[in-house]
């Protein structure tokens, strides 16, 4: 919540707590004004002022700045070190005040100078911390109550009103000193206040003249001891003060003085001296006077009655008790009251009771009588004049003149009233000057707490004359509008503080020590005046006490146990003097009470209107915020739904497209596989057919070749047999041999031709096989390349599919993360809402506990005051009954005000919570909007990615189409290759046919050769026969040689014939010629056999060549078989 709203709420709570603590049924809120009227008045004015500042100071326009200031303040630790030290120091001072512990008297002199400094220090501490540490840290209510008692300057800084409008209807209800005090030190501040009062009095028309009877410093101190003056201190310590902005407070206190003169007027009307306030005030920002607005003041003719009877029933003014360092104690005021009433002084154990002669008589007289307006004339005959009391009387008269100088524009009537009062005092002093000497000595010797009113009438005639002169000077100074000159003299007298050490602790503040009494002292002295009001024994004495002259009566009653002889006489004279003034004063007070009641009703009406307007503003704000939040939520919900639908559509499209691509890929792969399978099957079939053909052809050729070899072997064997069986004895074989030679030469040429043709055909077949193998290898390479291309395309398609699936999984994961993040943010928001509700509940509980503690403190104070009141005499009971009646009315009004303030607090807390929730909701909406923008950007990027994926799929489709085209081209090439292979097959068939034809030719040739061989066999048989015949002839010839050895020529011829025949035969059949048995011709036979042997070797060599050729052909065929078997699986 904004700090300004908190400050205004704290100001209103200050008044409530003042009511709870200060306005008990027997203790008035302020000492110098009636308990009911003054407290109700002050509370009404402060409440109105706080509400005015709360509702009219442009609250809603300043909320953002205040939120920034609160954030800056909250960033620092709440428990500021300076604030904690100040709190501890103030708690020590408060304990000393409560226990009556005396402190160094030098604090009296320091209070005047250190007041503003303390104020600024605590103000800075509050500004640093942003809040008072006590309420936020959960401190107990009693500790909070102690702070305002001990440190009024620190806590008074929190009271801040920002009334910049001079025409504010509540302006006249606020004290001027509350605005002007923080900017001035004590002497200067006291001098400037009369000027402001005079100016305000001139600005406001119907301002009636106020009673200047509260002219003494004791009266001022009593007013400072009231509980209500401490209200702001207590509330500031509790953390509800207005001091978060100390700089603004200094700048606006002057305006608050101008718009709040009603409190000071009421103080003057009800017996509270404004001049004493100016003198006693440390000038550190404490506002104590309550000046009534001009329209609420009485007419000049009524002022004399008011001056004579300056206090209503039930109110009183005790002597001022100055605690060390200017901090008062409420319990001291109560003890002072009990000491005065019961005539049994009970000073605190830490304070020594001084003799009555040591205290200032003038101060005591002012403390007892000036607050009732009776002055010294009513009890001049009670005691003889004392020389030690003359000078204080003069100072009290000077204070009276200062009060007149600070009063409002109707100063002439006040001067008339003062002159009449002074004349009465002079007459009483002359009549009763001889009867006063013994009573002060008696009271001081007894060690009681004598009433200052008893010593007050002891002034001499010269003192009265001085007082009259001072009053004339005050009147002239007030009419000129300048500050009174004796303020400086009063501040000069503050340099003599040793006197309080000799006095009773309850009256330790002298009139010349204005800075020694702090606003907390003035607030603490409230209960004692109430007790003094109820002291008189008769209704007449009560009326005289209400007027302003009850302190002498109170002092007489207090001295009653100690000095019974002189007291009866003084009671009689006091009653006679008080009876005359009480009657007129009662009428004036009744009229004043009616006027205050009217004013209170007006304030209530104004408060209700302001609250109603505030409630309407809050409702309007809440409704506007709700509508805005609803619209924002609807828009974001629609946007989120639209994005969700788009995302689902994109996912569906992506899924369908991916499925289509997968189906197309599967179809293409299936078609490609089918085509490859068919092509492989066809190629395998063709290769198998070629292998079968080649195998069959090679087998047939092998069979044929083996048959030919067998035939040749048979022929060779037959030839060898024929040669071996041929005889060499026939010459007719020569022709046959020649023919055989020709035949053999022809056969050799034919064999060479067959070998050449066979070699050429085999080479052609090998070349054709090699070409087919090369073609098959090329086809296999192409098929393998196509297979690799298909595998690569398949892997690429699989990679594309995997990428698409990964992208889909990533998108789903991101969506899940976003969903979880949104749920986490929602849970955080719900937890924050629950924590805020819990904090609000704890704050309400804490406030209720604090309120209960305050109620208990109030009940304790009530019990204490009741116990004191029970000890009073029978003469006060009637006045107590009247006070109780009036107090019940005040309590009713107080309760109504409390209810109003509670409602205001609730409204403030609700508004604070709503504003905080609005700010958080706005921040959350901004965060959600940013997140939605990020989601939109992500979806846009996903859409781009999907477009790219679709583009890649299109490219892949194009690639697949290109691959299909390439496959078709390869199929065409395979078809062409199959055609070429068919052509090659046909060529091979033709070559086989040629080989068959050649083989048939060879067959025919072999048949011819067989025929020739048959013929040769026949010839060999014939030759064999001839050889046999020749052998027979040779034997015959041998026989003839034996018989005829002398005929060598015949032998030679026969040998030649035989050699010729054998030579022909050996040359034909390559057999060695037969060995000649002729002894003379053995060398010729060996040569012939050698020739035959050579021929046989030649034939064997040819047979070996044929055998080697056949083996080579067989190896070639086997290699062809192996090559065909090896190429078949490759083609497959």
From Swiss-Prot:
Annotated coiled-coil segments of the chain: 576-727, 769-882, 918-1044
Compositional bias of kind Low complexity: 35-46, 458-480, 511-520
Record flagged with keyword rRNA-binding: no
Record's compositionally biased regions (Basic and acidic residues): 134-148, 189-206, 244-270, 278-303
Keywords associated with the record: Cell junction, Cilium biogenesis/degradation, Coiled coil, Cytoplasm, Cytoskeleton
Organism superkingdom: Eukaryota
Any Gene Ontology biological process: apical junction assembly
Localization (cell): Cytoplasm, Cytoskeleton, Microtubule organizing center, Centrosome, Centriole; Cytoplasm, Cytoskeleton, Spindle pole; Cell junction
GO CC annotation: anchoring junction; centriole; ciliary basal body; ciliary transition fiber; cytoplasm; spindle pole
Biased composition (Acidic residues): 226-235
Compositional bias per record (Polar residues), positions renumbered to this chain: 331-341, 388-410, 534-548
InterPro entries for this protein: FBF1, FBF1_C
Segments for region (Disordered): 18-50, 65-84, 89-570
Record flagged with keyword Cytoplasm: yes
Role played: Keratin-binding protein required for epithelial cell polarization. Required for ciliogenesis.
Name of the protein described by the UniProt record: Fas-binding factor 1 homolog
């Amino acid at each position: 919540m904004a700090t300004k709203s908190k400050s205004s709420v704290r100001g209103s709570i200050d008044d409530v707590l003042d009511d709870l603590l200060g306005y008990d049924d027997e203790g008035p809120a302020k000492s110098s004004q009636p308990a009911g009227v003054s407290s109700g008045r002050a509370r009404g004015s402060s409440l109105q002022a706080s509400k005015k500042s709360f509702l009219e100071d442009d609250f809603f326009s300043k909320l953002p700045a205040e939120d920034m200031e609160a954030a800056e303040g909250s960033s620092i630790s709440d428990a500021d070190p300076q604030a904690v030290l100040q709190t501890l120091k103030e708690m020590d001072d408060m304990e000393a005040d409560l226990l009556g512990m005396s402190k160094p008297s030098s604090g009296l002199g320091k209070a005047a100078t250190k007041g503003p400094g303390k104020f600024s220090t605590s103000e800075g501490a509050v500004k640093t911390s942003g809040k008072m540490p006590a309420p936020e840290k959960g401190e107990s209510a009693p500790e909070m109550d102690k702070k305002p008692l001990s440190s009024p300057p620190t806590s008074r800084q929190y009271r801040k009103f920002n009334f910049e409008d001079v025409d504010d209807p509540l302006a006249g209800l606020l004290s001027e000193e509350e605005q002007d005090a923080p900017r001035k030190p004590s002497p200067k501040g006291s001098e400037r206040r009369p000027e402001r009062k005079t100016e305000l009095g001139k600005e406001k028309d119907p301002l009636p003249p106020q009673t200047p009877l509260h002219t003494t410093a004791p009266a001022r101190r009593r007013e400072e001891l009231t509980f209500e003056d401490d209200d702001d201190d207590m509330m500031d310590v509790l953390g509800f003060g207005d001091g978060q902005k100390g700089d603004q407070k200094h700048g606006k206190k002057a305006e608050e003085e101008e718009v709040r003169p009603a409190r000071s007027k009421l103080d003057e009307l009800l017996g509270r001296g404004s001049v004493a306030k100016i003198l006693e005030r440390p000038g550190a920002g404490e506002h104590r006077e309550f000046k009534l607005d001009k329209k609420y003041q009485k007419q000049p003719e009524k002022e004399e009655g008011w001056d004579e009877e300056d206090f209503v029933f039930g109110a009183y003014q005790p002597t001022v008790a100055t605690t060390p360092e200017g901090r008062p104690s409420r319990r001291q005021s109560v003890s002072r009251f009990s000491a005065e009433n019961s005539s049994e002084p009970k000073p605190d154990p830490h304070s020594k009771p001084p003799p009555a002669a040591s205290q200032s008589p003038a101060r005591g007289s002012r403390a007892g009588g000036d607050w009732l307006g009776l002055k010294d004339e009513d009890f001049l005959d009670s005691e003889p004049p004392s020389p030690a009391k003359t000078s204080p009387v003069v100072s009290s008269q000077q204070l009276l003149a200062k009060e007149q100088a600070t009063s409002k524009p109707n100063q002439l009537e006040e001067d008339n009233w003062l002159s009449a009062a002074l004349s009465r005092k002079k007459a009483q002093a002359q009549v009763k000057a001889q009867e006063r000497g013994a009573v002060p000595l008696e009271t001081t010797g007894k060690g009681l707490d004598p009433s200052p009113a008893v010593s007050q009438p002891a002034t001499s005639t010269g003192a009265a004359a001085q007082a009259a002169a001072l009053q004339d000077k005050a009147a002239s100074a007030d009419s000129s509008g300048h500050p009174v000159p004796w303020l400086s003299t009063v501040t000069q007298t503050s340099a003599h503080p040793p006197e309080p050490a000799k006095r009773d602790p309850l009256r330790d503040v002298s009139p010349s020590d204005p800075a020694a009494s702090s606003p907390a002292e003035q607030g603490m002295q409230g209960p004692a005046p109430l007790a003094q009001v109820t002291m008189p024994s008769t209704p007449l004495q009560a009326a005289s006490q209400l007027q302003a002259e009850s302190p002498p009566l109170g002092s007489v009653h207090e001295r009653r146990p100690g000095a019974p002889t002189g007291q009866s006489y003084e009671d009689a004279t006091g009653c006679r003097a008080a009876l005359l003034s009480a009657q007129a004063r009662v009428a004036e007070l009744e009229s004043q009470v009616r006027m205050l009641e009217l004013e209170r009703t007006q304030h209530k009406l104004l408060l209700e209107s302001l609250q109603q307007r505030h409630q309407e503003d809050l409702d309007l704000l809440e409704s506007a915020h709700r509508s805005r939040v609803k619209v924002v939520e609807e828009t974001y919900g629609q946007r989120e739904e639209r994005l969700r639908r788009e995302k689902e559509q994109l996912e569906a499209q992506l899924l369908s497209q991916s499925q289509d691509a997968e189906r197309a890929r599967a179809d293409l792969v299936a078609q490609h596989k089918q085509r490859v399978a068919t092509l492989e099957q066809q190629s395998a079939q063709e290769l198998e057919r070629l292998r079968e053909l080649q195998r069959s052809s090679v087998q047939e050729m092998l069979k044929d070749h083996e048959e030919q070899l067998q035939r040749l072997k048979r022929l060779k064997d037959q030839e060898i047999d024929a040669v071996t069986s041929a005889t060499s004895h026939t010459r007719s074989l020569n022709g046959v041999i020649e023919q055989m030679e020709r035949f053999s030469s022809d056969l050799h040429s034919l064999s060479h031709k067959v070998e050449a043709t066979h070699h050429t055909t085999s080479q052609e077949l090998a070349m054709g096989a090699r070409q087919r193998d090369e073609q098959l290898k090329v086809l296999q390479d192409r098929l393998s390349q196509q297979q690799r291309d298909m595998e690569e395309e398949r892997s690429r398609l699989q990679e594309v599919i995997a990428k698409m699936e990964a992208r889909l999984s990533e998108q789903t994961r991101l969506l899940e993360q976003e969903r979880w993040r949104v749920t986490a943010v929602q849970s955080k928001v719900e937890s924050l809402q629950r924590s805020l509700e819990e904090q609000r509940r704890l704050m309400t509980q804490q406030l209720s506990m604090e309120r209960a503690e305050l109620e208990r403190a109030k009940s304790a104070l009530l019990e204490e005051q009741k116990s004191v009141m029970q000890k009073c005499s029978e003469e006060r009971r009637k006045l107590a009954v009247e006070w109780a009646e009036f107090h019940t009315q005040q309590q009713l009004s107080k309760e109504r005000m409390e209810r109003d303030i509670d409602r205001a607090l609730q409204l403030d807390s609700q508004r604070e919570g709503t504003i905080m929730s609005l700010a958080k909701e706005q921040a959350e909406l901004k965060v959600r909007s940013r997140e939605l923008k990020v989601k939109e950007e992500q979806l846009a990027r996903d859409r781009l990615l999907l477009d790219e994926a679709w583009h890649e799929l299109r490219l892949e489709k194009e690639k697949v189409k290109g691959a299909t085209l390439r496959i078709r081209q390869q199929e065409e090439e395979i078809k062409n290759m199959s055609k070429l292979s068919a052509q090659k097959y046909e060529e091979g068939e033709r070559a086989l046919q040629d080989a068959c034809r050649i083989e048939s030719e060879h067959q025919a040739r072999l048949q011819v050769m067989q025929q020739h061989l048959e013929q040769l066999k026949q010839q060999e048989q014939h030759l064999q026969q001839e050889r046999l015949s020749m052998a027979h002839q040779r034997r015959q010839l041998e026989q003839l040689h034996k018989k005829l050895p002398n005929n060598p020529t015949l032998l030679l011829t026969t040998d030649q014939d035989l050699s010729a025949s054998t030579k022909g035969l050996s040359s034909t059949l390559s057999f060695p010629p037969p060995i000649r048995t002729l002894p003379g011709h053995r060398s010729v036979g060996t040569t012939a056999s050698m020739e035959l042997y050579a021929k046989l070797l030649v034939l064997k060599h040819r047979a070996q060549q044929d055998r080697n050729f056949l083996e080579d052909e067989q190896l070639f065929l086997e290699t062809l078989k192996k090559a065909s078997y090896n190429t078949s699986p490759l083609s497959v």
